[in-house]
Amino acid sequence: LTDFTFMETKNGKLFTNTPNAIPGNDISKCDTSSAKFQSETTGLVDGIGSEEEILADIRSLVCMLPSNNEEDSSYEECNDDLNRVCADLANAKEDTAIALTMISDDNIFCEVKKAYAKDMVAGFIKLNGMTVGAVANRSKVYNEEAEVEAEFDGSLSADGAEKAAEFVQFCDAFNIPVLTLTNVSGFTASEYDEKRIAKSAAKLTYAFADATVPKVNVVIGKAFGSAYVTMNSKAVGADMVYAWPEAEIGMMDANQAAKIMYADADAATISVQGSAPKKPDLIFSSDGA
């Protein structure tokens, strides 16, 4: 029932059934009540850490949010130039948590559900002193040493879609504008996702379509098929849509299309037929620029 939940790592426990009550499991195998499990696997917890770390995270979050759902979006005085150049922004296309940090005032990004569904980034940034909710696809996670910690295939997963849907609904309830950075090639193809992706994608599509706050979408990479439609496209109500010059927008990824059209062909034929889609000569924003 809470909007955001934090959990202390050492002593915090959260469960419906105790780990030992789950058939075939005991706490030594998998502690389903731990902060790690609840943040990484279930997504019930937004942040974990020591008591001091949690209090610091809560302070950062509260500073981003309006006092209530009737107050205008949270503003504060800003000395960071809104039009400053982010020289390395294009290099952060894969890990959009870094990209959002770069564009935010004073490089402050308050990420929620950081450990869950890492292929989707959600959190709050400040732009010219105004709080903005940000949702972004992510294909790689880099650690502080600039090493790849996790890698994804650029598709939209069921967990990622639900994570984003819940966040967009919160932003809409509190009159917080939404920014999306889109780089998605399709839906995740796995047995786990196939059980849920249709419903999860519908939830995200509805969340964007139903939201009455300002919605801006920036296509920073691929934007293919129904997955792109789901990610705050013009078709579901985005107020403004922009695209980077190297963005690719189309009905389907060429390689995926080749697999469908040449289902009985060998791998070499599919590889040849699955050539990259031609990029448009002109990229138009929603206002025709």
Residue ranges and their predicted role:
Residues L1-A289:
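Ligand-binding clefts of soluble mixed alpha/beta catalytic domains
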